[in-house]
Amino acid sequence: MSNPIYKRILLKLSGEALQGDEGFGIDPSILDRMALEIKELIEMGVEVGVVLGGGNLFRGAKLAKAGMNRVVGDHMGMLATVMNGLAMRDALHRADVNAKLMSAFQLNGICDTYNWSEAIKMLREKRVVIFSAGTGSPFFTTDSAACLRGIEIEADIVLKATKVDGVYDKDPAKFADAKLYNQLTYAEVIEQELQVMDLAAFTLARDHGMPIRVFNMVKPGALKQVITGTAEGTIIS
């Protein structure tokens, strides 16, 4: 088994990644596969923090355009990430992986409230820590939450799991000649307006020197390849 090149990671999983081909909700087979891939990392000695999106269940920004108050919509979106977190924790427990679910705001009886020192303690004990409810504030995306939590727990890298192989110069779904980048600087991403994350999340990572790797989680085994240093996806640093 190859040695991991990272000691502690923050894995960002989009809600869409959990829905598979369903178009909505959670595909149990995808969830179980992701849990087993995370288990492999734990067995390699890697400390894993996870941030989940909620777009498979609810999109606050979309309803805000239809007239709903943005703050209300974002609160609903945060609760969607908690639902995804509960599903992920359950999948990890079924895979015999110790996991702790934390929420950015209080949800007594459902999960723990986010506590930095407790999260660090859990990570050191090789428990997967799932950070839900985004940053706890409206107007911030779950990508911002991923970068924030990654910086807070002093992760070596933020791994953004997507449905494409990395960062392209244009949309690969629309353009057959789209070029995949292996490596980029923060400045290149901003100059070329490449779609990696929203600007608030991305500049937070840049200002704190947090590297980001965008890779395709749909490919089985891709997560392990990233961890062992195989050229997978796009690294931004």
UniProtKB/Swiss-Prot annotation:
Region (Involved in allosteric activation by GTP): 20-25
GO biological process per UniProt: 'de novo' CTP biosynthetic process; UDP biosynthetic process
Pathways involved: Pyrimidine metabolism; CTP biosynthesis via de novo pathway; UDP from UMP (UMPK route): step 1/1
The enzyme's E.C. designation: 2.7.4.22
Keywords: Allosteric enzyme, ATP-binding, Cytoplasm, Kinase, Nucleotide-binding, Pyrimidine biosynthesis, Transferase
Signal peptide: none
Organism domain of life: Bacteria
Database matches in SUPFAM superfamilies: Carbamate kinase-like
Residues the entry annotates as binding UMP: G54, D74, T135, G136, S137, P138, F139, F140, T141, T142
Localization per Swiss-Prot or TrEMBL: Cytoplasm
Documented activity regulation: Allosterically activated by GTP. Inhibited by UTP.
Cited function: Catalyzes the reversible phosphorylation of UMP to UDP.
Family under the similarity heading: Belongs to the UMP kinase family.
Protein name: Uridylate kinase
Organism: Actinobacillus pleuropneumoniae serotype 5b (strain L20)
